[in-house]
Amino acid sequence: MLHDLPTHLQAGVRVLHSLPPTAPDPIAALGTAPARVVYLSTTAVYGSATQVDSSTPVDEQSGRARPRLAVERSIAAGPWSSLILRPAAIYGPGRGVQESLPRGAYHAGDNYVSRIHVDDLATHAEAALLSDLEGVYPVADEEPCTTREIAEFCARLLNLPNVPQPAPGTQPRTTSNRRVDGSAIRRALGIALLYPSYRTGIPVSLKFGAQ
């Protein structure tokens, strides 16, 4: 996949970078052509922080954070304007608790997780590319919840009698306990969420995922 990326772009283009960290980072091959780069990073860079907003420091010691932070800093130091977005857990049609729960691939607990619907993330990304805003911002919807709460919600939508137990040998995808406030970037870009909560986003995701 990476070898298919363009290495020569017309001057002045605006680039959305959402690839996971690689060495060397593919953005380095673009030279000075881009006028702007928007990078989709992750809230994992905040490590064990339980309350996150645009002023929360990153965790430099986190093994998951270091590769992402290296890419963030490389982009921020480039000869272009840049904006770093750090999305919370991304869900949508074919992706999310509503998909993993019936397979027994979801661990319900009392840890908090913030989320963002893929359509809302796309709105953020488009607005970010078209703006001149710079800096670093977390991205999330308005309703963090525990992994148990969302599992129970999905179980009701799917007409499951109860939350299925995880399949033997499966491991929780995340053990983080993090509530993310994404209001600062929405204000800065002047955008509103289509799905302010998983309560509205997951039913729509199930509808479109079944098509």
Residue positions per predicted region:
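Short-chain dehydrogenase/reductase
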Residues: 53-73, 111-116, 144
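C-terminal amphipathic/interface module of NAD(P)-dependent oxidoreductases
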Residues: 173-211
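NAD(P)-cofactor binding segment of oxidoreductase domains
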Residues: 4-42, 70-73
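Substrate-positioning beta->alpha
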Residues: 96-99, 106-129, 135
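Mid/C-terminal beta-alpha module of Rossmann-like enzyme folds, strongest
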Residues: 122-176
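Conserved Rossmann-fold NAD(P)-dependent oxidoreductase catalytic core, especially the SDR/UDP-sugar
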Residues: 27-63
